[in-house]
């Protein structure tokens, strides 16, 4: 019968003794091995008191100095970092034994501290001096628990340490707190200790027990490099004007660096930090010392990096970035007038001393900037280069090319320009130029035919452009690119101002099938230019671009088609009343067209004049900077701009022009439906039937002109016209204009026959406010009793046979309080009723003028001479118009017909129904209309 060793007390006691003896032998061997390793290593310095963090054992879950013994196999997978050189380790076996029994003899992090009484912990036997090699560098009595303090566990209950009483543990706790206070450490933070007590999976300490998560972060903050970095973070710096932004993921050590910089600013929306450029150098140097952090530097920001001699010492001591150096300053030179420039730069004592050596120096107390004459520019820049801590950016190369010219010229860019010889140009055109227009032609010729003519609207850019192009007539054929709504207006302008030019030599491109090079003068729209790009070879030598701001976006098809043509053309004449609608970036394409060598790259232009800022998605050029310098550059070599207020004394009070509508020309096939019906000239028809056919012809003309009217209004809106009036007669035209403005979300008012008196006054008052507003008005309902002097442009979409009504409508703008010259535009369509109404209006105005009853003379103010050839058929229709409108009551019949006209009730393509011409309008309705008409024609 065998006896189980577990049931026999004697065998159990002997087994325990053998196990304990073997364990002690193993511990002794490991301790000897550890001592041998320690003898091979050089002596290490002791850790300073600022590195020690005391911990309350009661809060950490341990029992004072107890530790968990680990299996050697498991400890091999722990952290492979080197042992802390600042921790204490015994050099001899005697020291190892004494550190457990005589704590007052143990070297601590506070060498000056001597415990008042000897503390001996009961239950600790000498064999424990041979402690496991996993914890030789731990100060069990000191303050370095954060460097891998051994944690207690339930497995230690079977060891002799379990018999330790609570009284010695209290003494040990008091001893640790006393030692911590004597080292000058701050009081404990319970929240920090609670975080330290939590286990972390980021790594293990040397003994194999879990290291708190806070430990690694504290080491990074203290400047102690880690041997192994778990992961890495990459980011970049983004320039944002005078500041820069850091885009990187969260890192506690990097956040601590951010908070130490004085110019820090945190954006909660984007969750990013940004700083002043003065802190760029310290931040980059501090980031380089953080393990696992990689920041991509700014482009061209080497000047903001500090020298190692000024910052390396501070960073080496604290591990944080040093204060920014105040010795380094950066700025730029900016042109402020045609003779002076200023230095826009921060304060520097050496630089101020240099400024005071300049003879032409001036200091502006308001702006706190120094300015100098351009003649001292080279001298100043040469001396500034000798200052090592100063970076003063020079003027752009483009401005330096004109430095001598800027110094010699006067304040006005056209004052000293010599008179051009215009003997080769038609005398009619030269004699018609106003003085300021002649100065504009001289400026263009002085610029060798390349300029941006940006005169205000109504100052005669068209006649100046034709005169400039005629000066270079030997270099024709000429290409004229215009909005589609004014193609035929330009055709008539060439015919009027250049009598020597054969009208057959003028080629107006209407469709994509037309040839672009068939004429000596070729007129094409922006949209068709992109479709006829293949016909631009060989290129034109002389090019006119009307409304050149249409090319402001380099990405559009019209701009891509026009820019190569303009760069190779010898003469480029750009016309625009509003060259830039909202920001300087819109000027770049026009500057590039006139002067391709000024700013070949847009980025250089954007940095200088658009306040370019780098954003996460790219560069933002929507801002503005150095606008005064840009204005001087444009006036000197690119642009000529005069406002109405500058030349008001040379302008007439009211200028009337007519604009052609291409609607009738662009319609293929047989006669369009708005052509005069054949029955209008038939003698066997009654007078009433002829009148009704005339009314139908007038109504269909209104419907046919709608697309051209809307196209012209849209061109005005795109040109930046904020306030203008549009007059029309038919309700269908007023509805179409209003609908288009609503679709474009353009603020406007409307006054017609259905508008009440109260609403009329409200609309007129709202139109006088400063905001952008357009007016859609009826010729007969809004030609009296209203004031719209805040506008200076009137557009007549339709004609009216009574010139007195038209003059009254014009005077809604040309009234007392009008400080500008008023422009009147009449939209006339060839091949419609306008062919007969326009000469009729001129004839009546001429008669009134001879009698002294009218100051307006359409024949002199417009280009309506020989508007149509009076063949037999047209002469009969003209006589019918003239005779019909001279009879009493016919005005009211025509007004009533126009008011009741419904384009949907009759197909304009159907033949005229004779049955509709037999009856007259109902008298009751006519009387009601008379009552309504009297309410609008009676004086207020």
UniProtKB/Swiss-Prot annotation:
Residues 669-679 have a biased composition (Pro residues). DNA damage-regulated phosphorylation by kinases that may include ATM, ATR and PRKDC. GO terms for cellular component: nuclear replication fork; nucleus; site of double-strand break. Residues 18-40 form a coiled coil. Residues 229-299, 325-396 form the HARP domain. It holds the Pfam family SNF2-rel_dom. Residues 17-40 have a biased composition (Basic and acidic residues). The modification Phosphoserine is found at residues 125, 131, 153, 200. ATP binds at residues 455-462. It is an enzyme of class 3 (hydrolase). Interacts with RPA2; the interaction is direct and mediates the recruitment by the RPA complex of SMARCAL1 to sites of DNA damage. This is SWI/SNF-related matrix-associated actin-dependent regulator of chromatin subfamily A-like protein 1.
